[in-house]
């Protein structure tokens, strides 16, 4: 039997990290067992669904490296098929027309609220006669189609993550609405629970992996599967992603769309790596830094936790920094080069850009950190007070003059790392100046402060961009 899993997002907003993690778990399991990962766009909410959100979801999946195996299916293309199965449920007596008005439903809910009862339809039109139906239609009433749910029934299934789950029919909110309102004997547009069952059966889905907030939907859908004599898939319900307070992660807590994570400077490999461990506790993992291929080889749905997974910026940032540190240098320089381009900064050469990328990568958590870390190499930083104070209290002006004179008199040309060390050593011996004073003075001239990246490697870059001498001269004039 071919194993088939699917992601079924609604295109009513930007690609959310919760949906992305669901996609990842489906994709990983498909990879692990040699199955297929499919996409179905559930766009039957016509008011909120937008094509740009569909594109955003598909682009986000590609960015994360989660490629699907077949052409994505649009639920809206299959409305006529959904209606055919609703008609079948009507004909076999598993569903019926309900003419309850919105006002009547509101009154019912108010009564239940006063009594402290949960909202639940009273199924008042389940046994209407043909004459009563004709009367409602002649009055111009619209009807929805409701699926009969036996309150005494117990629905149970074996969940691959949670084990046996049981649900009572009386807790499902009354008979289930399958379609929107329509006039006469028409059938309105199909709703979520019916469309999902029909489409999963049509796509031959064998495994449904989705969030725990769908558990009650699964109970309802199992009844529809059985009424239509469809084969049940295997169900797995993943834990929710939580905020620091243990509540479901929302836009109010932090950024949640994949676009935002990308724009902040997270690498797709790092975000996928982090999401995989967000609720998944593998027994055989030897490291927290694993590629998608490595993860797929050890991935088991049974290793996913039941409890909610708290989102940790600290952990995500650490993982992202590890990916930046281990990134191939040419690729890294090209990646952060896009940030330089946006700033209007032009490296003197590709070799120079690679050297700068190597120099700053250990100080980067996000890709956009390249802007602050690179800025002193493209723009003249102001001399900070701490820098001026150091130069004044340690005769830094003399140290800088000694370095400047050496560079000019010796006509040193390009200063590489070895040459930089040689210059500092020679000046220190010739003029009896501590090497630490010379290097700190030079750091102030280059960076405007006493902090910054490795000085010797930086000097090589400033020399190649022909700005080392000019920066020393600028600093001398300012003190």
Curated annotation (Swiss-Prot):
GO terms for molecular function: ATP binding; glutamate-tRNA ligase activity; tRNA binding; zinc ion binding. SUPFAM superfamilies: An anticodon-binding domain of class I aminoacyl-tRNA synthetases, Nucleotidylyl transferase. InterPro entries: aa-tRNA-synth_I_cd-bd, aa-tRNA-synth_I_codon-bd_sub2, aa-tRNA-synth_I_CS, aa_tRNA-synth_I_cd-bd_sf, Glu-tRNA-ligase_bac/mito, Glu-tRNA-synth_I_codon-bd_sub1, Glu/Gln-tRNA-synth, Glu/Gln-tRNA-synth_Ib_cat-dom. It is found in: Cytoplasm. A motif ('HIGH' region) lies at residues 9-19. It catalyses: tRNA(Glu) + L-glutamate + ATP = L-glutamyl-tRNA(Glu) + AMP + diphosphate. Its main location: cytoplasm. A motif ('KMSKS' region) lies at residues 248-252. It comes from the Bacteria. Catalyzes the attachment of glutamate to tRNA(Glu) in a two-step reaction: glutamate is first activated by ATP to form Glu-AMP and then transferred to the acceptor end of tRNA(Glu). Monomer. Belongs to the class-I aminoacyl-tRNA synthetase family. Glutamate--tRNA ligase type 1 subfamily. This is Glutamate--tRNA ligase. The lineage of its organism: Bacteria, Bacillati, Cyanobacteriota, Cyanophyceae, Synechococcales.
């Amino acid at each position: 039997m071919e194993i088939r899993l699917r992601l079924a997002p609604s295109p009513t907003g930007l690609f959310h990290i919760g949906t992305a993690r669901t996609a990842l778990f489906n994709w990983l399991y498909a990879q692990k067992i040699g199955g297929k990962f499919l996409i179905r766009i559930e766009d039957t909410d016509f008011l909120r669904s937008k094509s740009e959100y569909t594109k955003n979801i598909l682009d986000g999946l590609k960015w994360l490296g989660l490629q699907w195996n077949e052409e994505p299916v649009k639920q809206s293309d299959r409305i006529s098929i959904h209606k055919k199965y609703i008609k079948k449920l009507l004909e076999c007596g598993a569903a019926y027309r309900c003419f309850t008005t919105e006002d009547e439903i509101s009154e019912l809910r108010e009564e239940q609220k006063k009594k402290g009862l949960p909202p639940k339809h009273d199924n008042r039109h389940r046994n209407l006669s043909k004459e009563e139906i004709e009367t409602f239609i002649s009055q111009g009433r619209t009807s929805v189609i409701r699926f009969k749910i036996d309150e005494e029934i117990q629905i149970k299934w074996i969940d691959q993550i949670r084990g046996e789950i049981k649900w009572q029919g009386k807790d499902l909110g009354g008979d289930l609405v399958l379609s929107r309102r329509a006039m006469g004997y028409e059938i309105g547009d199909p709703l979520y629970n019916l469309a999902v069952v029909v489409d999963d059966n049509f796509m031959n889905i064998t495994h449904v992996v989705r969030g725990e907030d769908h558990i009650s939907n699964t109970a309802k859908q199992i009844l529809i599967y059985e009424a239509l004599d469809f084969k049940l898939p295997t169900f797995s319900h993943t834990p929710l992603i939580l905020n620091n307070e243990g509540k479901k992660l929302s836009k109010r807590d932090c950024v949640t769309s994949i676009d935002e994570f990308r724009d902040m400077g997270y690498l797709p490999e790092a975000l996928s790596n982090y999401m995989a461990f967000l609720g998944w506790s593998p027994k055989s993992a030897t490291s927290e830094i694993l590629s998608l291929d490595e993860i797929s080889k050890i991935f088991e749905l049974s290793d996913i936790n039941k409890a909610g997974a708290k989102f940790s910026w600290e952990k995500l940032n650490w993982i992202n920094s590890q990916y930046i540190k281990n990134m191939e240098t040419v690729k890294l320089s090209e990646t952060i080069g896009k940030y330089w381009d946006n700033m209007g900064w032009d490296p003197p050469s590709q070799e120079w850009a690679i050297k700068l990328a190597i120099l700053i990568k250990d100080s980067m958590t996000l890709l956009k950190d390249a802007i602050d870390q690179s800025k002193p190499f493209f723009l003249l930083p102001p001399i900070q007070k701490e820098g001026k104070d150091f130069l004044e209290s340690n005769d830094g002006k003399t140290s800088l003059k000694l370095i400047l004179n050496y560079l000019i008199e010796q006509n040193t040309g390009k200063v590489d790392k070895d040459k930089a060390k040689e210059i500092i050593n020679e000046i220190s011996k010739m003029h009896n100046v501590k090497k630490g004073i010379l290097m700190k003075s030079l750091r102030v001239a280059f960076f405007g402060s006493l902090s910054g990246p490795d000085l010797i490697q930086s000097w090589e870059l400033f020399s190649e961009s022909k700005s080392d001498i000019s920066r020393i001269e600028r600093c001398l004039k300012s003190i």
